[in-house]
Every structure is written in C-alpha cells, then in structure tokens.
Amino acid sequence: MEEEEPEIRELQRPGKGTNTRIPGHDRTHICQAIAELRGALGEESISTDDEDLQSHGYSEWSSINSERLPVAVAYPKTTEEVSRIAKVCSKYRMPMVPYSGGSSLEGNFSAPHGGMCIDFVFMDKILALHDEDMDVVVQPAVQWMHLNDQIKHAGLFFPVDPGPSAKIGGMVGTCCSGTNAVKYGTMKNWVINLTVVLADGRIIKTRRRPRKTSAGYNLTGLFVGAEGTLGIVTEITLQLAVIPEVTTVGVVSFPSIRHAASAAMQAIRMSLPVQAMEIMDEVQMGVINRAGGTGKTWKEVPTLFFKFAGTKAGVKESISLAQSIAKANSGENFQFSKGEQEMHALWSARKEALWSMVSLRKGAEQIWSTDVAVPISRLADIIGMHILQP
C-alpha cells in the first residue's frame, strides 16, 4: 500500500495573494521531507494545519510581515531532534526558521521563502541552576519572567527585560534589550555559551562555562543577534545578577519633550545610577489613559520613568540627584513608589504602552511599531519629527 502524501495547501497571508510555495523548490521534495520527518519524529511532530501555519508566519501586532508562510511546523523535544530536522531540510534544500515566543514586532520569525518553521514550545525547561557560579542553563522556550520566578529563591535574577511574553531563544536571536539596558546592557552581555545546530545538522557548543576564556574565536557573540541565520540555538547558558536590596520607581512630568530629553541627557552625563530610564511623550500618555489598563489617570505631558535599584542608602541618594536634575529642567509632580505594589503600578504605564495602542485600534487599523536609534543628543529631534509627521 502506498504511503499517503502529506497535504500541502496553497495558503495566503491575510490580505495578500501570494502563496507559500518556495521559489525553485519542488513540491515533491517538500512532501518527501515532511513524510521523512514524520517517520523519524512521529506524526504529531510535524503540522501542516492552516491555523498553525498562519500563527507561525504572521503577527497582527507587527508592521513587518512576509508575504509567505511556512509550509510546515516542526515541534522538536530535544537537540538531537532539531539536528534530525536540519539534516532532512538540508537534504531537500528547505529553509528553516526557528520560533520560540512569537512576540517579535520586527518580523523576526517570518518565512519569506516558506520552508520549515521549528517551534520550541516543548523545549521549555530550566536544565541547571549553578547559584554559586551565578549562571543557569535553559532551553529556548523558557520565558524570561518565568525564569526569574524560578530562581529568585537563590537571590538571583536575569536582568534583560523585553516584552513580557518574550522567550530566551528569541531574545538570543535578536540580541534583545529592555528597559534595564541602561544599567545591565543587552542580551550579548549575559550569554555565556550556546548549543547550536548548524544548517547541515551538526551540533556545536560555542564555548565552556567559565567566564574568562581566550581559547578560540568568540563564537557565542557570532550567534547572538544572528536571528537564526547561522544556526539554530537549542540550549543557552546565561549569566545571572544578584537581586538588588531595594528597587523603586520614580515618575516625573515635563512641559515639553525637549525638557524631558534634556533631563535624560544630564542624568546620563552625571552617571545617575539608575536601573532603567524611559521617556514617553504626551501622545503615549494619552493612549494609556484611554486604554485604562494601569488603574491610574496620568497627566498627558512628556514623562520620564526612572527605576532605581541598589542599597537603601544608594537608592535614596539616586532619588535625590534625579529630583535635582528634573527640577533644573522644569520637571514637576515627581512621584516615587513606597512599596512593591506601588512600584509595579507606576512602571506599568511603560510596560502597557504597546498593548494600550493595540486595544484602541479601530476596524482594520494597523499598529506600526519599530525601534530607532540615534545619539542621545538627537533624542528630542527624533521624537519631534514623529510628532510633526504623524
């Protein structure tokens, strides 16, 4: 009896007329690759379901979506299974796209040439915590907030804090940052080593666990930020930080975006010891009020958010310096949290910004979200350009 050929549909991305066929790739080869992987990993390990393909190739909150979708989604459970997937895809010349949290706003998991999406949903374990060495070994689908919940008993935390739903694999692939970047830097500063499956299925480890090494090339740095183009990351060893004795949040309002930007620049030049510093204009503050997700009505003016962390004495001194800088730049209505609950309430305005905009969409309106980078001296200019040219 002949084996039934896997069903490959001509799916379209929402609003587009382009199908998922891979240019220059034979349909028979695609079917053979899927059948071979199902035989090796199990029928349930490879999906060609319409909804799976849509959800793994398109994001409604991203302004950058490919016109194509993957032709199949693989669900490996081990590094060895990822290696097997890579070998088969290499054999049949199928592109591969790794997928962890799907929270990208920049089209990082889109499949412009179709191919195989590799979803790490079943590789979500914390493999080892070395509290004395202050590091942890995780799989790519571990969510960073869940990681911090699991290791806080050791007095440690992972300080890179992008969107709440982000997972470690995608954070490595994009070399992400977050609000804590002012003090702790970005993802590349916290990755010790990686286990990587190369395009032909070979498995490599980029380096050993000791912090200091001068043996060989900096392969770890090569893969961090490569977005899966050089290999598929299946295991990550992360450096951890000590949970600060005290953490508090401060919020201050300004009459204009230039006043707020000037205060931010002065804070950096004076080495104000903050864990995070974020600026939001009057438009964003108004959006947050209309969405109503923070449980607080905010003054709709340019606003700076500070997060202070350290010893009690150090935080007290930092708050005093921040107040002086704000006052010198016409800042007013300075608030700072007096407990953990109030701290989360104040900081929620920054974290809820994107979701507030999403909730206020009308009909088929799209949210255009992206990152821009300018020298700190041009911060006010770039925000001003956005306001003048909405």
Which residues are covered by each model-predicted region?
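N-terminal flexible segment immediately upstream of the FAD-binding catalytic core
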Residues: 1-87, 91, 104-134, 284-293, ...
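C-terminal substrate-recognition/cap domain of FAD-linked oxidoreductases
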Residues: 3-8, 47-57, 242, 248, ...
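Generic structural signal for well-ordered, non-membrane alpha-helical segments
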Residues: 26-34, 75, 79-82, 140-147, ...
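Glycine-rich, histidine-containing beta strand-loop boundary motifs that form or position
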Residues: 98-102, 109, 120, 140, ...
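FAD-binding subdomain of flavoenzyme oxidoreductases
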Residues: 125-278
